[in-house]
Design a protein with these regions (language model features):
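Sec-dependent signal peptide cleavage junction
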Residues: 15-33
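Positively charged n-region of N-terminal signal peptides that target proteins for export
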Residues: 1-4
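Beta-strand-enriched, solvent-exposed domains that form extended recognition/catalytic surfaces
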Residues: 111-117, 121-254, 575-617
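Beta/coil-rich, acidic/histidine-enriched accessory regions frequently appended to metallopeptidases
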Residues: 126-137, 142, 488-616
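Solvent-exposed, low-complexity, repeat-rich "mucin-like" stalks and linkers
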Residues: 32-81, 164-165, 174, 570, ...
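Catalytic cores of extracellular degradative/oxidative enzymes
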Residues: 265-267, 275-464, 468-483, 492
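Serine/threonine-rich, repeat-prone extracellular segments and beta-strand-based repeat modules
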Residues: 79-124
Length: 617
């Protein structure tokens, strides 16, 4: 008799110290990990970042507040995301008594990994003392798998605040204490024509930071762009340090972080009257002009009751878009690795269109960012531009379409998009209109944006809707990683064939989308079921209705296979055009029309145009 082997797991507690941060790491079971080389791990401890060493002049502050944006810390965890609201702290600072003080911060993730951080606060009475803050900055792991297919999201536009608001004419000094790359500081206003960016050198030189454009100073919110690590550097705890020095003319940033006290935030901003404030969670940060302060909540028809509701909505949106991209924090394949990054949303009086996406931020073309505080199609459309990549570009023109695919599947998901609204419309209600131009001979690239989207959604909905897009992205990344080069239309055809074992070339060609000869040969040699447009194939209305009812199909222009048509003895006519200089050379020869291995009909060539009638499915 065989005996069962019982494995006893021992949990070991290790206390480690890195850059003054203590991590109590609980080595839990890694059985949940889907790929041993992915970033995901039960052993990953949270990191604490923000103001990690502080010096202030005696009496410059009435009191020390750990929520003061200048002195605040935050926490994030690769698996759990933002943990800032989970931070616990102890310790006090007497701002009127010279001395060294300590604030201890502690945060624990869902795998019971604990990170502790002691922040030293020095109160000095030196005459020329200024506020001095050392800030720890997080870094972002490589997103090589998204880079290789051109999916940028806002990966290289993730920014961290410095806790300050710079009034017009006010400057600060800054330098890098520890980083192996230069860092970029950008001043955000509500007009790109009123802002610049500056670079902090990794050599540690002090830089005077001030937003002066063409000799004119402007108030602004300085943000520093998060560094993205190389593929070889997989240290998720890697941080950089910078040092800031400034006087009392530099203002505390009016700042709201997810789950903060909204009333306190609004009251403080009303009191300060700073020209800009900042709200954020782990997926989105918005620089808000003072004029929009009362337009963020309870203002728009499709607006939000609280700032947390707003931030939660965009968290759901971005999470869902990541799912539609086919990426995961705990992937089975490394090509599907996800990494959390944050979108910057801003007003820009000199932007483009109504709103725009430019790779490192989303802008509202106005001096107001208020429009982004409403649940609407525009927000989905612009955020999703970051997800297009090379699969959304190419000969099959999807420039303003690939992003709308994501927007569509989110908008019809009423667990996320809770207001009424469907930019595309119900497929069975719009299909006659959307197929009109196609049947008149227009190519896919000649269609309007809405019709192009309809064509894709009609295809995806035959399978698994948005999940089909996710599976296609997974397939596509794997192909590109293996060194292949594909047009987007060939990628669509090959992906559907490999994933679902169907040939969609007839559907693609019905929209006059050109598939390469190489791909045609490859797919037709598979002898897999072909999918075509139902109403294109069946002209008899009685037969059409029998198929619709019998197969529980809602769309006349939905996709069907020949096997389905055979069940209803459907027949159709086929027009063949032979392009040759002298068709007489082919007289007497025959053409076999086949479906897989079955010969449906044999016709003799006697003209350059041949009409085949009553062709069985």
């Amino acid at each position: 008799m065989k005996r069962k082997l019982v494995i006893v797991m021992i949990i070991v507690m290790i206390l480690s110290t890195v850059n003054g941060i203590q991590r109590n790491i609980v080595f839990a079971s890694e059985q949940e990990k889907n790929n041993e080389n992915s970033y995901w791990s039960t052993k990953n401890a949270p990191i604490i970042y923000g103001a990690t060493k502080i010096t202030i002049k005696k009496g410059i502050l009435d009191s020390f507040d750990v929520k003061d944006a200048r002195f605040r810390v935050f926490a994030k965890d690769f698996e759990d995301g933002d943990l800032t609201d989970k931070i616990k702290y102890s310790g006090t600072v007497d701002t009127n008594t010279v001395g060294e003080y300590k604030i201890t911060y502690t945060v624990q993730d869902s795998h019971n990994n604990i990170t502790n951080l002691d922040v030293k606060v020095y109160v000095t009475d030196e005459e020329d003392a200024k506020i001095n803050v050392e800030r720890t900055l997080y870094t972002i792991p490589s997103m090589w798998n998204l880079d290789m297919i051109g999916v940028m999201r806002c990966n290289y536009g993730d920014r961290q605040n410095l806790g300050i608001y710079l009034p017009e004419g006010v400057s600060i000094k800054a330098r890098i204490l520890n980083a192996d790359t230069d860092l970029r500081v950008q001043y955000i206003t509500n007009d790109a024509n009123k802002e610049i960016s500056q670079t902090l050198s990794k050599n540690g030189d002090w830089v005077t930071l001030q937003n002066i454009k063409d000799g004119v100073g402007y108030s602004s919110v300085p943000l520093i762009t998060s560094a993205v690590l190389s593929k070889e550097n997989t240290d998720l705890t890697k941080t950089y340090k910078i040092e800031l020095e400034y006087d009392e003319n530099v203002k505390e940033l009016n700042y709201y972080h997810y789950k903060d006290n909204e009333e306190n935030f609004m009251n403080k901003w009303e009191q300060d009257q700073n020209e800009y404030g900042l709200i954020e969670n782990e997926v989105i940060q918005v620089v808000v002009p003072l004029a929009d302060k009362d337009k963020m909540t309870n203002y728009h028809r499709n607006g939000f009751a609280t700032l947390d509701q707003y931030l939660e909505y965009y968290k759901k949106v971005v999470d869902r878009m990541d799912e539609l991209l086919g990426v995961s924090l705990n992937p089975e394949k490394l090509t599907d690795q996800n990494v959390r990054t944050k979108y910057l949303i801003r007003a820009n009086a000199h932007g483009a269109g109504a709103a725009y996406y430019n790779g490192n931020h989303v802008g509202v073309n106005s001096s107001s960012v208020s429009a982004f505080f409403e649940m609407n199609w525009g927000g989905l459309h612009e955020i999703a531009h970051g997800y297009q990549g090379s699969l959304g570009k190419g000969e099959m023109q999807l420039g303003e379409v690939a992003n709308n695919i994501l927007g569509h599947y989110i908008q019809i998901d009423k667990s996320i998009y809770t207001y009424s609204g469907d930019w595309l419309g119900a497929i069975n209600q719009i299909e006659e209109n959307k197929n009109k131009a196609r049947l008149e001979g227009k190519t896919y690239n000649e269609q309007d944006v809405s019709t192009k989207l309809y064509m894709i959604v009609n295809l995806f909905d035959h399978f698994e809707g948005g999940e089909t897009y996710a599976k296609m992205f997974k397939w596509y990344r794997e192909q590109i990683n293996n060194g292949r080069t594909l047009t987007n239309q060939d990628a669509y055809v090959e992906a559907i064939a490999d994933i679902y074992n169907f040939n969609i070339i007839p559907y693609m060609e019905s929209w006059k989308i050109n598939i390469s000869e190489e791909t045609k040969i490859k797919i037709y040699e598979k002898n897999i079921p072909m999918l075509g447009v139902l109403k294109d194939t069946v002209e008899d209305e009685d037969v059409l209705n029998k198929i619709l009812n019998g197969e529980n199909i809602n769309e006349k222009y939905g996709l069907v296979t020949n096997e389905t048509l055979k069940k209803y003895n459907a027949v159709g006519n086929l027009k063949l055009t032979i392009k040759i200089d002298d068709v007489k050379k082919l007289n007497g020869k025959t053409i076999k029309i086949i479906d897989g291995n079955n010969v449906l009909k044999t016709v003799e060539i006697n003209n350059s145009v041949i009409l085949v009638q009553d062709l069985p499915a």
